[in-house]
Amino acid sequence: MFAIIGPTASGKSDLAIKLALKLNYEILSLDSLSIYKEIDIASAKPSKEELSKVKHYGVNEIYPNEKFDVMKFIEIYKKIPHKNIIIVGGTGFYLKAMLEGISQMPEITDEIKKKAKQKDYAFFESVDPDFASKISPNDTYRIQKGLEIYFATKTPPSVYFKNNPPKPVLPDIPIFEIAVDRSVLRERIKKRTDKMFNSGLIDEVAYLEKKYRDRRLPALKAIGIKEVLDYFNGKYTLKTLKEKIITNTARLAKRQQTFNKTQFKKKISAPLEELEEIILSEIK
C-alpha cells in the first residue's frame, strides 16, 4: 500500500490507474468531489471505462445531498478486504487525518446540535478557555463542534481529547508526490477546464440544480459548480466563466501544494514523467 499526492490536475488519477494495472492493485480515492454520484464532469473523476478496468473505492459512494467527512473515508478504507491499494487524491487533509488518526467522537443528537447553536464564543470560552484560546472567535464551525462535545459528554473538549487521543488508521506508508511547476500546472488546469466544458459541464450543473434545488449543499459549492451557478444568474459571460474556474482551480492547487509541502515531510517527490519508474522500483 502506498499513496500518491499532488495538486489538482497534476495527473494523479492517470498515474494511479497505470500503476494499479501493472501491480494488480486497486485504488482508494480521497477526493472530496469524486465521492459523489452524478458529479462526473466537474469532479474530473475517472471515466466509466477506467472505473471498469480498476476497482475504485471512494468514488460514486454518496449522493450530492448527503453529508460526509473524514470518517466516511475511514469507513470505506476499513471495508476494503485487502490492502493492495493505491491511495490517491488532492485532498491531503484526509490522508493526514488517516495517518495521524482522529479521536473517537461521541454521539451527537439533533437536540445537542440545536443546543450548541444557541451558544456563542463567550460561553465556549467560559467552559473551555484552553481550547477556545486556540481558535478564532469567528470560527463558528469549530466552536459548534466543541460545544457539541461539551454538551454530549459534560466534559470540556480539551479534556475530552486528552482522554481520547487519536489512533492512526493507516500504517506508515510510502508517500509519493507529483512535483509540478506552477506554470505547467496552470496549463494542465486550462486544458482540463476546456475538456470539462466540451464534455457538458454546464448541462451537468443544470441537472444538479434542478434535481437538488439547494445551492447551499457543500457539493454545489465546489469549484466548477459554484461558478456555473453564478453564470446562470448572469454574473459571468461564458468566457469569463471559464477564466474564473481556471483561476479558482489554480488557487486551490497552490493551497494543496503548500499543504503537502508542510504536512508530509517524509515523501518522495519527482516530476510526473519520472514518478512511475521510481514508484515501481520502490514498491517491487
Swiss-Prot record:
InterPro entries noted in UniProt: Dimethylallyltransferase, IPT, P-loop_NTPase
This enzyme's EC code(s): 2.5.1.75
Q: Name one GO biological process term.
A: tRNA modification
User: Binding positions for ATP?
Assistant: 6-13
UniProt lists the family membership as follows: Belongs to the IPP transferase family.
Q: Region Interaction with substrate tRNA: list its residue ranges.
A: 31-34
Query: Signal sequence: where?
Result: none
This protein's record includes keyword Magnesium? yes
- Per the UniProt record, the site (Interaction with substrate tRNA) maps to 91
Q: What is this protein called?
A: tRNA dimethylallyltransferase
Listed under catalytic activity are: adenosine(37) in tRNA + dimethylallyl diphosphate = N(6)-dimethylallyladenosine(37) in tRNA + diphosphate
- Listed Pfam families: IPPT
Q: What is the lineage of its organism?
A: Bacteria, Pseudomonadati, Campylobacterota, Epsilonproteobacteria, Nautiliales
Q: Which residues bind substrate?
A: 8-13
Q: Top-level EC class, please? A: transferase
Q: Which organism is it from?
A: Nautilia profundicola (strain ATCC BAA-1463 / DSM 18972 / AmH)
